[in-house]
A protein has these predicted regions:
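C-terminal active-site/capping subdomain that shapes the small-molecule cofactor and substrate pocket
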Residues: 249-333
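Active-site phosphate/pyrophosphate-binding segments
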Residues: 5-15, 27-31, 37-40, 158-261, ...
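Conserved, well-structured ligand/cofactor-binding cores
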Residues: 7-36, 78-83, 172, 294-308
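A generic structural motif
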Residues: 71-74, 233-244, 292-301
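Short gly/ser/thr-rich secondary-structure transition/capping motifs
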Residues: 22-29, 67-73, 189-192
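Short helix-capping/linker segments at secondary-structure and domain boundaries
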Residues: 25-27, 66, 156-166, 231-232, ...
C-alpha cells in the first residue's frame, strides 16, 4: 500500500509540529524592516500552496486583525496598493511567475514589502530592494510548507502589533498537534481509522466539501486542494452560509451525476446556532439525491487548534486517498506540464 509513496510524503505529515516549533526562531533570525505604525492595510500575493496561508491568517485572526487583509492570486496588484500597504509576497519556490509579476506591479505604489520564500528569484528581488525577508527551509512541496509559511507570518505580524491576542508561546498548540498526529498515524487510532475509512468512501468519487464562515472557510479549500494535488481526485468546495444563497439550488437538477458525489461537512463543534440549523437543512436537501454525507468535526478549544485539527485530518485523508488511487502524493504531472510549456513562451 505504501510503495507508491516514493517521496516519503508521510514524513511531512508526521513532522508538521516541527514547522510550528521552528517558525518563531526563523522570524527572530529574519531581517524585518517594515514600519508597523505606517501600515493601514495588508496585501498578500501568492498562488497555490503559498497563497492559502494568507487566507488562513484572515480566518484565524478574523476577530483580532487591526487592519484589512486581502489575498490576491494572479499577475496584477490592485490600485489601492500605496505607501500605507504592507505587501506580503509569498512564493515557496521563489519562482512563481504570477506572484513575481504582481510584486513588480505593486512596487509602483511605493508600499512596504515582506517576502517569504525558500530562495529563487523572490529572494534575489527582496535582497536587491532591501525588503523584509523571511527565509524558510527548502525541500518541501509548497503545500506541505504551510506550517512554515503561516506561523512565521503569524509571528512576524504578531510581534509587529498588527493583530491583538498574539500568542508568542505556541507550545500548547504544538503539543495538541503532536497528540493528534500520533492518533492519525497509529493504525488502530480513531483519527487514523477515520482518515482511512473516509479515503475508502471517497475512492472513485467526487467530493463536495463544505465548511462555514468565518473561521473555517479556508479549511474547505485546503481539503479541496489537497485532494487535487495529493490524491489526484476531483473535488469542489464551498462555504456556509454563502452556498445557501446559490449552490443549494443546483441540487434541483435531475441528474444521474449525483451518484458520483460524496458531501463532506467540516464542522465547528461550537458553531453559531444558525449555522448548525443551516447545515441540518442543507443535508436534508442533499440526502434527497442519495448523496452520502460525512460530518468531520473540529477538535480543541482555540481557533488555531480547531482550524489546524481539520487541516491535519484533511491532509491525512488526502494521503490515504492517494495511496488508494495508487498515486504518489508528491507528484503533480499536470502542473509540471503547464510550467514547462509556459516556460517555452
Amino acid at each position: 500500500m505504501y510503495s507508491v509513496d516514493k517521496s516519503n510524503f508521510k514524513s511531512m505529515l508526521i513532522n508538521f509540529d516541527k514547522q510550528i516549533q521552528e517558525s518563531s526562531e526563523i522570524v527572530k533570525n529574519s531581517s524585518l524592516n517594515f514600519e508597523p505604525s505606517k501600515i493601514t492595510n495588508i496585501l498578500y500575493l501568492g498562488m497555490g500552496g503559498s497563497a492559502i496561508a494568507g487566507n488562513l491568517l484572515y480566518d484565524t485572526l478574523f476577530d483580532h486583525l487591526k487592519v484589512p487583509l486581502d489575498v490576491v492570486r494572479g499577475y496584477l496588484a490592485p490600485a489601492y496598493c500605496n505607501e500605507h500597504t504592507l505587501v506580503i509576497v509569498s512564493s515557496y519556490s521563489g519562482n512563481t511567475e504570477e506572484t513575481l509579476s504582481a510584486a513588480e506591479k505593486a512596487r509602483a505604489g511605493k508600499a512596504q514589502f515582506l517576502a517569504i520564500t525558500s530562495g529563487g528569484k523572490l529572494k534575489e528581488m527582496a535582497e536587491a530592494n532591501q525588503w523584509s525577508l523571511i527565509l524558510i527551509p527548502e525541500g518541501f512541496p509548497p503545500r506541505q510548507a504551510l506550517g512554515y509559511i503561516y506561523f512565521t507570518l503569524y509571528h512576524a505580524l504578531g510581534t509587529a502589533g498588527l493583530f491583538t491576542d498574539y500568542k508568542r508561546n505556541l507550545t500548547p498548540l504544538v503539543h495538541f498537534i503532536q497528540k493528534l498526529t500520533v492518533r492519525c498515524d497509529q493504525q488502530q487510532s480513531d483519527c487514523n481509522i477515520l482518515s482511512r475509512e473516509l479515503a475508502k468512501t471517497l475512492h472513485g468519487k467526487i467530493s463536495l466539501i463544505y465548511s462555514s464562515a468565518p473561521y473555517l472557510q479556508t479549511v474547505a479549500r485546503r481539503w479541496q486542494n489537497q485532494f487535487h494535488e495529493n490524491s489526484k481526485s476531483m473535488a469542489f468546495a464551498n462555504v456556509l452560509p454563502e452556498m445557501n444563497h446559490n449552490e443549494i439550488v443546483g441540487f434541483e437538477q435531475d441528474s444521474t451525476a449525483f451518484s458520483h458525489f460524496v458531501a463532506i461537512f467540516l464542522r465547528d463543534k461550537d458553531a453559531h446556532p444558525r449555522i448548525e440549523k443551516r447545515i441540518e437543512l442543507t443535508q436534508i436537501i442533499i440526502k434527497k439525491h442519495g448523496i452520502e454525507i460525512v460530518d468531520i468535526y473540529t477538535e480543541g478549544h482555540t481557533i488555531l487548534e480547531k482550524v489546524f485539527s481539520l487541516i491535519l485530518k484533511g491532509d491525512w485523508v488526502s494521503y490515504y486517498l492517494a495511496l488508494s488511487h495508487q498515486k504518489d502524493p508528491v507528484k503533480i504531472k499536470n502542473i509540471d506540464f503547464l510550467k514547462s510549456e509556459l516556460a517555452k513562451l
